[in-house]
């Protein structure tokens, strides 16, 4: 018996975001380096972006928009949060994100509070009121 996917034991000790494949809403969990992601569980690591800030982006309406546009919708309205869809989400270069927006993203991701994540992402992408409304919020 052997797995299809290659096992990287060092990944266990890395901080990462864990994302289940099939979910109704984005369910992005910060993992501090104690668990290994197994089947149907995607992971994201980053040496550049703060993972809590990235968690806020992935919990926001913008991530759901990207995934819902590209993903196959499963029975019951569930979306597949697969790697190929998550890769389509464009994030700015972390070094170009203003310090105040960085902190807002990190704080929102750490809670995690969907409304706070959306507000931080609205600021990150400098979204208009119309764009914010399309994603389900006004940023207030």
Swiss-Prot record:
Example of a GO biological process term: DNA restriction-modification system
Molecular function GO labels: DNA binding; site-specific DNA-methyltransferase (adenine-specific) activity
EC number: 2.1.1.72
Signal sequence region: none
Entry's family note: Belongs to the N(4)/N(6)-methyltransferase family.
Catalysed conversion reaction: a 2'-deoxyadenosine in DNA + S-adenosyl-L-methionine = an N(6)-methyl-2'-deoxyadenosine in DNA + S-adenosyl-L-homocysteine + H(+)
Lineage, uppermost ranks: Bacteria, Pseudomonadati, Pseudomonadota, Alphaproteobacteria, Rhodospirillales
Origin: domain of life: Bacteria
Keywords attached to this entry: DNA-binding, Methyltransferase, Restriction system, S-adenosyl-L-methionine, Transferase
Keyword Methyltransferase: yes
Protein known as: Type II methyltransferase M.AbrI
């Amino acid at each position: 018996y052997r797995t299809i996917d290659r096992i990287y034991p060092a990944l266990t000790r890395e901080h990462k975001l864990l994302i289940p494949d099939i979910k109704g809403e984005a369910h992005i969990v910060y993992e501090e380096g104690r668990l290994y992601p197994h089947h149907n569980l995607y992971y994201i690591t980053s040496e550049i972006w703060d993972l809590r800030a990235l968690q806020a982006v992935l919990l926001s309406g913008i991530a759901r928009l990207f995934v819902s546009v590209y993903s196959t919708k499963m029975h019951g309205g569930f979306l597949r949060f697969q790697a190929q869809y998550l890769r389509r989400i464009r994030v700015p270069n972390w070094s170009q994100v203003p310090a105040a927006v960085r902190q807002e993203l990190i704080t929102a991701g750490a809670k995690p509070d969907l409304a706070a994540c959306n507000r931080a992402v609205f600021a990150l992408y400098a979204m208009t009121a119309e764009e914010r409304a399309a994603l389900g919020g006004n940023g207030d």
